[in-house]
């Protein structure tokens, strides 16, 4: 009986120490975790529409990356720059449905933005928190994201 209590107490200590960390979820092999989401950088270049479709085929609930804080952008930049160096990646922000406002392809609220201007689709630089408008038919690298 004493051994059972000791082992049970050990599990309680471990569970308590892990609560509040990202230990409660796990991303698939090859994906990186941040704030209860999983991210993967792909080295294929494609247009925005093909990139979004590609992401939806990678994992259930996956879309082109959406950003909701500068910290999240910094995390993605830390993943893209070592692989892609100085380049651009598609992000899920666009106006490809020709509505009045841009929106994230994953349906989340547009609560953070770092771009100005023009075209229907947005890219993010792999080096910093800078977004640019770009023609949707341009071929760019892809970062996919889903909620874990």
From Swiss-Prot:
Instruction: Mention one GO molecular function.
Output: toxin activity
Q: What is the annotated signal peptide range for this record?
A: 1-23
Q: Which PANTHER family match?
A: MANNOSE, PHOSPHOLIPASE, LECTIN RECEPTOR RELATED (PTHR22803)
Subunit structure and binding partners: Tetramer of heterodimers of alpha and beta subunits (alphabeta)(4); disulfide-linked.
The subcellular localization recorded is: Secreted
Bridged cysteine pairs (disulfide): 27-38, 55-144, 121-136
Q: Which organism is it from?
A: Protobothrops flavoviridis
| UniProt cross-references to InterPro entries, sorted A to Z | C-type_lectin-like, C-type_lectin-like/link_sf, C-type_lectin/snaclec_domain, C-type_lectin_CS, CTDL_fold
Family as reported in the entry's similarity comment: Belongs to the snaclec family.
Q: Where would I find the C-type lectin domain in this sequence?
A: 34-145
**Gene Ontology terms: cellular component:** extracellular region
- This chain's protein is named Snaclec flavocetin-A subunit beta
Where's it mainly located? secreted
Explain the purpose of this protein.
Strong platelet aggregation inhibitor. Binds specifically to platelet glycoprotein Ibalpha (GP1BA) with high affinity and inhibits vWF-dependent platelet aggregation. Has also been observed to induce small agglutinates in washed platelets by binding to GPIb.
Q: What other note does the entry give for this protein?
A: Negative results: has no effect on ADP- and collagen-induced platelet aggregation in platelet rich plasma.
**Entry comment describing in which tissues the protein is expressed:** Expressed by the venom gland.
Keywords of this protein's UniProt record, alphabetized? Disulfide bond, Hemostasis impairing toxin, Platelet aggregation inhibiting toxin, Secreted, Signal, Toxin
């Amino acid at each position: 009986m004493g051994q059972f209590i000791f082992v049970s107490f050990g599990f309680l200590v471990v569970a308590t120490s892990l609560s509040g960390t990202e230990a409660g979820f796990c991303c698939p092999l090859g994906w990186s975790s941040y704030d209860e989401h999983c991210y993967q950088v792909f080295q294929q270049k494609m247009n925005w529409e093909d990139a979004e479709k590609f992401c939806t085929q990678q994992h259930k609930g996956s879309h082109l990356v959406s950003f909701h804080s500068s910290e999240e952008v910094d995390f993605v930049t830390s993943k893209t720059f070592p692989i892609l160096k100085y380049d651009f990646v598609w992000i899920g922000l666009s106006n490809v449905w020709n509505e009045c406002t841009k929106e994230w392809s994953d349906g989340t609220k547009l609560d953070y933005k770092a771009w100005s201007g023009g075209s229907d689709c947005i890219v993010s630089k792999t080096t910093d928190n800078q977004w640019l408008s770009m023609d949707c038919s341009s071929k760019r690298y892809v970062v996919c994201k889903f909620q874990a």
